[in-house]
Structures are given as C-alpha cells and as structure tokens.
C-alpha cells in the first residue's frame, strides 16, 4: 500500500470512530506542521508549546484565601516569568471558594487573580486582587508534579479593597455563573465546539474555561449524576436522557472536555471533578457515574484513581454505554504505521498501553458496574459483529470488562440512538433509582 493510501486508510479509521470530517483532520495536520516549524525557530515560546502539545501540559492548582466579603467569579491568569514581554500564556475562570486551576506547559510563571470590580463585564489590567510574589515564580515541570499531571501552586490571598495594576494589558470577558447551565441546549454545547475539542483542545478550553458543569444551581441534597460524553461529542448527546431523570431527585452534572487529549489525563481530571462534587458543602452521599462511548474509558480511568484505597462511600453505581473496552482495531493499524493522530485516538487503539494499564486495575467488588452494549439494527440472524455501527461487539464486550460487570444489557440501537431509546432510558432511570436509594 502506498503512503497516500495508508494515510487515507488511517483517516477513514479515525473518521469511523469520531464521525469527524477529513477536512478537520487534514487541517489539524497542517497546523501541527506549522507549529513544529515555528517552535524550531522559537523553542522557548510557551504559547507555541501550549498549542503544539496541550497533552504535555500540567494542571496547576491552588487555593484562594477569601476575605469576609467573598467576590463573585474571578479570573486566574498565568504570565511567562522569563519572557521580556511577559506574555499571558493562559487564563481561566476561578471561584474563590474552590480555588483556581489552569493548564500550562512546563516553565516559570507569575499568577494573578482578577475581579470585575467596576462590573463592566470584563477583567481588566487594573483589577488585580491577588498575585504570586513577582520574585517567586511558580515552577511548572515534572519534578514539581505529584503524579505527572498536577502541580500544587501557592495559596493566593485576595484583597478587593486594594487592587493593583498588572504590568501587561489584560482585557478578558467575564462569564457569569461559568459552571452553571440551564440545559444541554445551551449554545455552549454546540457540536462544532466538540469537534474543536478533538483537534484544538487549547481553543476549546479557552472557550469553556472549565470541565464540569451543573444543570441548574447545584443541590447537594439530591443524587449527583455525572454524565460523560464520548469523542467528538458534547453534553448535547444527552438531550433526551437528561429529561428522563427526575429533577426532584437528581442533580445532573456534565463533564465537558476536549476529547482529543490523552485519556489518562482526562480520567484523572474527571476523578478530581467527582471528588470535588462529593466534598462540596452538604457532603453529597450519593454519586452515580454514567458514560457513553469513549467517555466510558475516561470514566473507567477516573474510577481507578478514585478507588485507589477502596470504593469511596459516596460512589453508588457506574454505568457505561457502548464503550470500546477492547479498543478499535483500525486505529491500531494507523498507530503501527506511524500515522500522526491526536492522543485520544492513540489511546483507543486496540492493544494500546493505555487500555492495557486500564484493565490491570480491577474495580472494587462493592461498586455496581452495569455494562450496556448496542448491536444496531438486528438482522434475521441476530446481532452482528459490527455492533452499534461504530464500535464492534467484541470491543464493547471485551472479556476483561465482562469479568467485572455486575450486569450486562444489550440494545438494538445505533451508537448514538441508544441515548434516545425510550425503553433504554426507562431502564436506566430504574437502575439509578435502585442503586441510589437508601444509605450506602
């Protein structure tokens, strides 16, 4: 097979998994080539590093010392300490009560917190309410990271009454209630942004400024249900599923992530999000995790992290729907040929190191795990090998996943169609009701 034909075959394999256009993939490859060229000429440029390999970035997190008159949403911004121009490498929304979090490539940074003091809808240069000491930059690298993914940064104290002015211009639009949405129909969940998350994760995160979003104001007295979409997806994939859950009983959370990133990184970030939800004021005692497609691999990785010392008391049930536990064979071929792919595609390749590690850690025996699979439209001879039209049955029913499942349920639906099947949704609601009733 010629190089061109191999590239086309790899592209077809990827498109089968993500249903993304070939144009997006080819554009991504062109951009990567251009970024490589620019980095060769300017290897110290942290902005270029962040764009080129966001999967090699670290999650930088720290606490915020809050005064009595706690502010509304804040902005955390990171500036390149060593650059003469002191460029802003990244910025994200932050909430005083929960701290700040930002993704950054290795380097030395000055961090600053901004508040919209004049209430004009923007964070501006002269609205700095807290910062790290200018002569003590935050070092971000593998040595400072506890687990290769996260770096603990200093606590930043904020003072709303003595704002200062930063050395470089800042003008960033404020996003009111950045982590609360009214429904999955919010324009925020446009499928076009989901595709951007595959190929341009930094652009995706600049838009979302977060990972986990609640439908309506969080209510810790309810059962917390966390939904995880698949590759190239958004929470809008759950448009029919969400209304099927009783709003008086369930608080729905949406894990909204750039699905081109590596699954190890995404799984650990999801684990942190779940743990944060469970530790909110009011201490929710009932948390359910429901994931679709590749989201099941992200969720499974999160569970490995959450259950290092046994099942947390609050975790009541895990449901995966049409998840490729055995990986995707066609993507495996592309990896072996050396085709450049986004990190998540590499991880879902059949036999990938990620999948091997994933299944080496068993789920706690006291965590109910319900494995749902789809076979598309059944023929006269029963379910076919092709599965739901996207993920094969052997991959959905990988023996390692079957061995850990509390129950398995098959549905004659397509890969996405299962999320709107009335019978499947009724069964899911009944399953969640049973699993989350009563004390743990």
Per-range role (PLM):
Residues 25, 227-229, 252-359:
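Serine-dependent carboxylesterase/thioesterase catalytic core
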Residues 235-242, 264, 268, 393-394:
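Short, surface-exposed alpha-helical segments at coil->helix boundaries
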Residues 104-105, 217-220, 246-247, 281-283, ...:
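Extracellular/periplasmic catalytic domains that process cell-envelope and extracellular macromolecules
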Residues 304-440:
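Helical cap/lid subdomain of alpha/beta-hydrolase-fold lipid enzymes
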Residues 1-11:
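Bacterial N-terminal signal peptides that target proteins for export
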